[in-house]
């Protein structure tokens, strides 16, 4: 393994040790892993951004697209670390000016996202970031919006992944998660 991969793995291990677990949240049978404690400690927040920056390496990234709302927590900071712009993907009616809109399927129904039409130039290289990859519906929707702008999706980045939901199967660009989440549902 390269030194870079070893460093990312060490950072991921330390970050994962700082998660809090909540059994049966938000519903029975789910073990919720809360990554918000990372943001209460500046050294951990810096390590989260460093791990993603190390992963991206020397790839040229023009924009980081963050999903509402947890993609907003680290997306702008990662964009700054990569010398890239940050572009939010939001629920309908939250962005001024002309927007592209997409409807996507989630675990329990459908939802919509929007992105401003004129903020990403055609051919720009983008990362799409969010906290958790679950069913892949939200990330898929953001990817469809990125395509409408003419951007090239370099990769989807997530802090965690609920592997058993197979959300990465819905995405048509490489997927990277700092650490995998649950492989199956929680049972007591």
Swiss-Prot record:
The residues forming the signal peptide are: none
Q: Which GO terms describe its biological process?
A: adenine salvage; AMP salvage; purine ribonucleoside salvage
Supply the source organism for this entry.
Answer: Candida albicans (strain SC5314 / ATCC MYA-2876)
Quick one: which residues bind AMP?
134-138
Q: Which UniProt keywords apply?
A: Cytoplasm, Glycosyltransferase, Magnesium, Metal-binding, Nucleus, Purine salvage, Transferase
Q: What is this protein called?
A: Adenine phosphoribosyltransferase
Q: Name one Pfam family in it.
A: Pribosyltran
Keyword Lipid biosynthesis on entry: no
Q: Name one GO cellular component term.
A: fungal biofilm matrix
Q: What does this protein do?
A: Catalyzes a salvage reaction resulting in the formation of AMP, that is energically less costly than de novo synthesis.
What reaction does this enzyme carry out catalytically?
Answer: AMP + diphosphate = 5-phospho-alpha-D-ribose 1-diphosphate + adenine
Do you know which Gene3D superfamilies this protein is assigned to?
3.40.50.2020
Sorted alphabetically, which PROSITE patterns does this protein's record hold?
PUR_PYR_PR_TRANSFER
Its annotated compartments are: Cytoplasm; Nucleus
What cofactors does this protein use?
Mg(2+)
Q: What class of enzyme is it?
A: transferase
MF annotations from Gene Ontology: adenine binding; adenine phosphoribosyltransferase activity; AMP binding; metal ion binding
Known EC number: 2.4.2.7
Coding gene? APT1
Q: Which family does it belong to?
A: Belongs to the purine/pyrimidine phosphoribosyltransferase family.
């Amino acid at each position: 393994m390269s030194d870079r991969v070893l460093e990312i793995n060490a950072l991921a291990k330390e970050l994962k040790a700082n998660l809090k677990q909540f059994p049966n949240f938000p519903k029975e049978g789910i073990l919720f892993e809360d990554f918000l404690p990372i943001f209460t400690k500046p050294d951990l927040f810096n390590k989260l951004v460093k791990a993603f920056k190390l992963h991206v390496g020397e790839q040229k990234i023009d924009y980081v697209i963050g999903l509402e709302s947890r993609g907003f927590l680290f997306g702008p900071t990662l964009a700054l670390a990569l010398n890239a712009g940050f572009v939010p993907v939001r629920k309908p009616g939250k962005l001024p000016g002309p927007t592209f809109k997409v409807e996507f399927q989630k675990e329990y129904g459908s939802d919509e996202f929007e992105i401003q039409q004129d903020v990403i130039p055609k051919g720009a290289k983008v990362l799409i970031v969010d906290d958790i990859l679950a069913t892949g519906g939200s990330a898929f929707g953001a990817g469809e919006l990125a395509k409408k702008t003419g951007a090239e999706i370099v990769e989807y980045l997530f802090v965690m992944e609920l592997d058993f939901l197979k959300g990465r199967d819905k995405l048509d660009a490489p997927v990277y998660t700092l650490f995998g989440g649950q492989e199956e549902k929680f049972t007591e």
